[in-house]
């Protein structure tokens, strides 16, 4: 789950109406909403829509770009009102895709997935994150969305700051990370870039501490928790993760003034060398890649965990909404989605510094940034180990708000780790009972 405050609308004329002897051949309109607000993402989308133009000269793509928060607030209501997009990205969790699928606001994509062979470019484990059953079961039933980008939440680090502080690289495990935090603090540098005024950096840090305690071989209970099959957020690992987060705030490991800093500003401060570490996602590659000292690694796990999970998965899935009410409109929407997840599009995303969910062609002619090389290597290893974890806010429609309301209390010492875990669990159990 990523956030960037932005709202941008553009109408890209994918072909123009042809006027022949005074008669206009009307172009098809394809309203599209997406969340690609970062500068390099905008550039990639402009290139991709331009290439769609070459294939579909009779289509007008009306693109609206929103932050994920804005999309979540407006999309369902817009589609219900009949004035939303025909194609849109939708966050895969219960709050958004689950609710819209259950309400009949999304079109199943299984026939198109078979027609276009989407399963050849993305693993079943990734595609299953767009599935919702008629009974509201996450990860099962029809597929409603497929993604352009893979996402890993890992640990960005400034190599020069760590060397200056006497930290030995690579950091082997969680104990080594704890040692590095103290050495950086002793050197007079903020160990962790953090901002809680807007965005989800503390959520991703909490989830990373928690999920790296889970080995891929033992992930079934966590999968059940996220997919709404039952479980608890009050386990020892959940409480310990909250305790670490609170301790780091109390010990001054977080960027000074973090409560008044947004996630985006924290990323910029990290890029400028104001902190040693940033726990964030691969969607930040384009933002931080201009600093050659910055590298990316999986979040360090306890030494005894053989194949630790990493928070992540895929970016919001491309969907066809019920606004596309005819077969012709749905076919057009599917052709646009195919364009967004094709191997050729994977090359475009890689060229702009992002991690594509669809595998790059073996003969792809693209020069990868150092960060992206690191990201792809980690992505391939995590996929091979079945160790791509989850975004914890997918577990209920209100979990993102619950985490966002309670983490500031935890960091400020106004809530114990046990109370924090209990708040998450109360949200989750209420959701299970409502099903």
Model feature map: region roles:
Residues 110-125, 212-240, 301-310, 370, ...:
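Short, solvent-exposed loop/beta-turn-alpha elements that line the ligand-binding surface or hinge
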Residues 134-148, 153, 178-230, 275:
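Extracytoplasmic/periplasmic solute-binding protein
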Residues 94-152, 205, 296-298:
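Hinge/lid segment of periplasmic solute-binding proteins
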Residues 181-183, 223-258:
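Glycine-centered hinge/linker elements that transmit conformational signals in sensory
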Residues 35, 95, 204-205, 209-214, ...:
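Extracytoplasmic/periplasmic substrate-binding proteins
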Residues 355-362, 375-429:
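C-terminal capping/gating helix-and-loop segments adjacent to ligand/active sites or protein-protein/ligand interfaces
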Residues 50, 54, 81, 165, ...:
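Extracytoplasmic/periplasmic substrate-recognition and gating elements
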Residues 15, 25-105, 114-121, 169, ...:
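Conserved N-terminal structural module of periplasmic/extracytoplasmic solute-binding proteins
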